[in-house]
């Protein structure tokens, strides 16, 4: 059983704060259309409400597609203990927000809806990016292209980046020796 979140099919969730643009990080992204103050609810992350089991199934299908040379991006967000939101729908421009190791926004569940919130003031023209928070287990499968000074080269949650740096340093020492 699934249901739609607040935006209607075929209509993007309106946001006066962002515009879609080509991204230096990956494909398309969202940029600030005007200055965004810290704490602003920038845009709602919308899509199909699905069970955890269905979310797991879709994730496996999309990861298999990536292995077959297709997009394979996963746009599933945790909503609560029973349901997730699959944002892989055309009316969800928030799905275009790329990962950044130096995030300027973050997702937050507020009254059963997922909002992207500004962590700091964001300048007009600046690309939005949040920490995807991937676990360390499959870190090699998620190279990071954000290019920030704090980026270890792979998408992992902030608390695990030091581990990736240590693993890479050990590999570099082994290769040099």
Predicted regions, residues:
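C-terminal SET catalytic tail plus cysteine-rich post-SET Zn-binding segment of SAM-dependent SET-domain
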Residues: 100-177
